[in-house]
């Protein structure tokens, strides 16, 4: 049962091959057995899961099943879940129980999906390796010495290890695509505003976007259909029609114009990763697509621009955690200032504190123009690069990450090296366009992802292009040893 994809589970449930309760029990048993190995799930919710599965079985019996009814998943612990701890991977929110459901959680529950639990993540989504979590690092099922990527590392490891057929994630600078690449999964960052951010704990509000993680593009199409849509409770949500993403999955890629940016194949790209990605792009040429070199000249500024804008927005968003209203509160403060200082000092981890300090500095009176304003101006240039390129080509392809998964502890002392893990994904968030990562092979025995970038609200095309690759390859069907 655990080998089936979301689409296969949904079809089997509707055909009566097994019940939602049976499939839910099977995944809960795998979480019990394998979670101690990966540390992917920090809050299992077996009671709620079985109740939701029974309700789904009733819907199926009544002939009221939708395309996702009865299918289990895990939610990244950044999404508020009513009555269930929502920690965001931080000591600051270790005791926080959300009083309401995030829109994404509510929509998928309404679609009949079954929440198995909450997935581990980098603290406040700040990290590329899932090593900043208060609950300890997550291990990559493909190699337990390796990181799963971040910040949605728990979501990625849970799906790769077959603890769940699907997961939600969030992507601020690559946090869905990079862990999907490092764990051999399919992961989609939708267009900014496509998926509601209501109830999704904020890191950098102009960059954050929720999205699905699963093994196939067909599964992502089903999940995005359940997640996407306008929400009046999120001022950045866009009122744009939600198509049936599964309808166009099988379109031919003959004549598709694929742009390959020379900037994504320069210094810093592991030669083996490069070979795998080039071979994947070659598959499209064989399928009748047209490949042309393009240039995205300003994307080389993505890392410095991102590390001004994202920390600036984070320092503002995280100012709400003060030890007064909710979250961690220090013991016996001597006065209000001591309460603020110690609650924040003890409640936040090192990486979060580093980014708050960087962001506060970038926003401070004497430096605002030199840093924050300048970064926003360069961000516009990056966006213009994509707009120009996507007028000439249909999609853009390149590596998702410059290397395969690195070992746990290998980059913790070198923040800049860690930040460069997202060098190919950051520009997509800065521009707000959608990006997809699909499994394209292995290098040094660890998975490699192919990144496919499209125009605003063109997720259907990305999923179609990814699906066509998965029809002629079987990288998405590989299983990590010990998790069969």
UniProtKB/Swiss-Prot annotation:
Entry protein name: Glutamyl-tRNA(Gln) amidotransferase subunit A
Record-linked InterPro entries: Amidase, Amidase_CS, Amidase_dom, AS_sf, GatA
Listed GO CC annotations: glutamyl-tRNA(Gln) amidotransferase complex
Location of the active site: 76, 151, 175
Biological processes, Gene Ontology terms: translation
Keyword ATP-binding (UniProt): yes
Top-level enzyme category: ligase
One Pfam family matching this protein: Amidase
UniProt similarity note: Belongs to the amidase family. GatA subfamily.
Keyword Protein biosynthesis: yes
Summary of the function given for this chain in its UniProt record: Allows the formation of correctly charged Gln-tRNA(Gln) through the transamidation of misacylated Glu-tRNA(Gln) in organisms which lack glutaminyl-tRNA synthetase. The reaction takes place in the presence of glutamine and ATP through an activated gamma-phospho-Glu-tRNA(Gln).
Coiled-coil intervals, chain numbering: none
EC number: 6.3.5.7
Subunit structure: Heterotrimer of A, B and C subunits.
Keyword entries, A-Z: ATP-binding, Ligase, Nucleotide-binding, Protein biosynthesis
Annotated gene: gatA
One function term, GO molecular function aspect: glutaminyl-tRNA synthase (glutamine-hydrolyzing) activity
Reactions catalysed, as given in the entry: L-glutamyl-tRNA(Gln) + L-glutamine + ATP + H2O = L-glutaminyl-tRNA(Gln) + L-glutamate + ADP + phosphate + H(+)
């Amino acid at each position: 049962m655990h080998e089936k994809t979301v689409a296969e589970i949904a079809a089997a449930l509707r055909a009566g091959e097994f019940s939602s309760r049976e499939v839910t029990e099977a995944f809960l048993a795998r979480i019990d057995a394998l979670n101690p190995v990966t540390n992917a799930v920090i809050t299992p919710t077996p009671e709620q899961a079985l109740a939701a599965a029974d309700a789904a079985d009733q819907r199926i019996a009544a002939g009221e099943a939708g395309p996702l009814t009865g299918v289990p998943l895990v939610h990244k612990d950044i999404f508020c879940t009513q009555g269930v701890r929502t920690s965001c991977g931080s000591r600051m929110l270790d005791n926080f129980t959300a009083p309401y459901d995030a829109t994404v959680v509510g929509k998928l529950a309404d679609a009949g999906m079954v929440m198995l639990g909450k997935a581990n993540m980098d603290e406040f989504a700040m990290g590329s390796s899932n090593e900043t979590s208060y609950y300890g690092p997550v291990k990559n099922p493909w190699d337990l010495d390796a990181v799963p990527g971040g910040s949605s590392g728990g979501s990625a490891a849970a799906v790769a290890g077959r603890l769940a057929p699907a997961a939600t994630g969030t992507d601020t600078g690559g946090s869905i695509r990079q862990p999907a690449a490092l764990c051999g999964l399919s992961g989609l960052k939708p267009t900014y505003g496509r998926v509601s951010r209501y109830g999704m704990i904020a890191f950098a509000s102009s960059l954050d976007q929720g999205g699905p993680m699963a093994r196939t593009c067909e599964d992502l199409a089903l999940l995005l259909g359940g997640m996407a849509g306008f929400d009046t409770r999120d001022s950045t949500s866009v009122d744009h029609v939600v198509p049936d993403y599964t309808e166009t999955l099988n379109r031919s890629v003959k004549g598709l114009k694929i742009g390959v940016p020379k900037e994504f194949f320069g210094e810093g790209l592991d030669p083996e990763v490069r070979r795998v990605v080039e071979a994947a792009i070659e598959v499209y040429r064989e399928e009748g697509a047209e490949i042309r070199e393009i240039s995205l000249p300003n994307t080389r500024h993505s890392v410095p621009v991102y590390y001004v804008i994202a920390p600036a927005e984070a320092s503002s968003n995280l100012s709400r955690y003060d030890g007064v209203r909710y979250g961690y509160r220090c013991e016996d403060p001597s006065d209000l200032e001591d309460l603020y200082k110690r609650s924040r000092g003890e409640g936040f981890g090192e990486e979060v504190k580093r980014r708050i300090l960087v962001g506060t500095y970038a926003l401070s009176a004497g430096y605002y123009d030199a840093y924050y304003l300048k970064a926003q101006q360069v961000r516009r240039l990056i966006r213009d690069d994509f707009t120009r390129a996507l007028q000439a080509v249909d999609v853009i392809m390149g590596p998702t990450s410059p290397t395969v998964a690195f070992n746990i502890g290998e980059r913790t002392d070198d923040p800049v090296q860690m930040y460069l893990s997202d060098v190919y994904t950051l520009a997509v968030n800065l521009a707000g366009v959608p990006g997809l990562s699909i499994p394209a092979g292995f290098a040094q025995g660890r998975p490699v992802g192919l990144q496919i970038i499209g125009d605003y609200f063109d997720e259907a095309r990305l999923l179609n292009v990814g699906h066509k690759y998965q029809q002629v390859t079987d990288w998405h069907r590989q299983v990590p040893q010990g998790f069969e």
